[in-house]
Amino acid sequence: MALLEICCYSMECALTAQRNGADRIELCAAPKEGGLTPSFGILRSVREHITIPVHPIIRPRGGDFYYTDGEFAAMLEDIRLVRELGFPGLVTGVLTVDGDVDMSRMEKIMAAAGPLAVTFHRAFDMCANPFNALKNLADAGVARVLTSGQKADAAQGLSIIMELIAQGDAPIIMAGAGVRANNLQNFLDAGVREVHSSAGVLLPSPMRYRNQGLSMSADIQADEYSRYRVEGAAVAENERNHCSPSGQMIFTVASCRPI
């Protein structure tokens, strides 16, 4: 039986994913930032109530992937916490100012992670040379890489994804961004073993009173009266339609556009 991974931004989403057939969860906060490190409260609650494997993201802020010393120190502390809480894996990524994988920091990340499976997220798509980056990540012992082939969506980047897959069996190449049921077969035909797609909806906030003249966001255009929710029916449908009984493919369903 193939694995189905859902990227969740709340305890409620994690429960929905689990109930509807997910085999693994990527846990994030802040969907509008593309996924940030979840709070301690969310981490502990999910660890206590979710029985399928959960991989939290370690990303202290939105934006680029070159971090200050203080930000990186916080990332290492978060990794230690995730490990202490008993999670089986995590998702993260760090770059140099020149767009290379920061190998010095990756060594520290891998040491802090210990036995946890590490996924290098779409910071990979911001690398100057994806093939050098993949070799470095293989040397570092990373389990998988999430990538759109350095294009706006994975369909456009499929040729690069195929070249990356041809480099070897490890790390696993997970295609993400714009992967849908109607183009999934293209990725399978290309030899993709894991894909990253969407199974969520934005719902209106239940707030009746709304102060339309005031925003709590730095982005005054931000919609603060909508909330992301994993759609159970979509999870179940994807699990039925796209999980191969051979167990050779992992279908990854993510909310919004997590890194």
Curated annotation (Swiss-Prot):
Q: Does the keyword Hydrolase apply?
A: no
Entries under Pfam families matching the protein:
CutC
The answer to keyword ATP-binding applying to this record is no
Keywords, alphabetical: Cytoplasm
One GO term in the molecular function aspect is: copper ion binding
GO cellular component: a single term:
cytoplasm
Which subcellular locations apply to this protein? Cytoplasm
Member of which family?
Answer: Belongs to the CutC family.
How is this protein organized at the quaternary level? Answer: Homodimer.
**NCBIfam families given for it?**
PRK11572.1
What is the protein's given name? PF03932 family protein CutC
What organism does the UniProt record list as the source? Salmonella typhi
